[in-house]
Amino acid sequence: MFSTLNALDFQQQFRDSNSCLEYLSEMKWKDGYTCRKCGCLIYTKGYTPFSRRCASCRYDESPTAHTIFHKLKFSILKAFHGVFRYSRKKGMSSYELSKELSISQKTAWLFHRKIQQAMASSGKHPLTGEVHIDEFVTGGPEPIKRGRSLGRKKKSLMMAEVINGKKIGRIYCTKIANYKKETIYPIIQRTVAKDARVVTDEFPTYDKLKEKFKKAKQRRSRNGSAFENLHQQIMNLKGWLRGIHHHCGEHHYQLYLDEFCFRTNRRNREHGIFYSLMTRIASIQSKTFKELTAFAA
């Protein structure tokens, strides 16, 4: 397609709705066409621009069907612009997006959630090599309490590959309900390769981690200096939440963590974050507004 995309490239590449639909069609069927209804591999030109019609059952599928662009309340050109803006270094708030695209706050909020949904980790690529792990909290100040406070702050666990002892590789971050072994250990086991060299601080929760990871070890935090690279990523996350989004509720907190990790993990990609994000968008079916706002009790 093209390498890292800047604003001028974007404007030249996506001039109108047809150029967006053509690109989306190429992304959606880049690995070949298969009819969703009957499995036929042969297609003809569909009813609408860049849609495909099954040669067997005549099922007609548009490029936007089964993607976050399905039944949009605004033009696909605006939607592409929104994806491009969210693929930039820091992204933007839904409030800013609503002003930039001249759409309602509710519509911008929903579109942001759909993009974040596409940014969620696939879970197919465990962290490898040396992996540093630490827990942290986000939110406003609360009264000093003994031990690890379980107040209203949002609790999180970050895991990061550390290359040659100083460079951060891929990261993964998830919200946690508490700091108990039975909560944290399964998350680490799902996210980190078994042969990884897991390094944590001396918090008691991690004292049995060696039973799960043979190369696991604990070291003194020394006020964070022993995990400087990991803590820098945590500070970057906190700064991004405060500076761009100002506030995120408990129910959608994981979506913001996913967005931060997605962007961080693709910072050096040859084709840029926009290409990676569009690849995801073209292959997943988005949730409805009702599904995205269905909070757990």
Positions of predicted regions on the chain:
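Residue-level recognition of single "structural anchor" positions
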Residues: 1-297
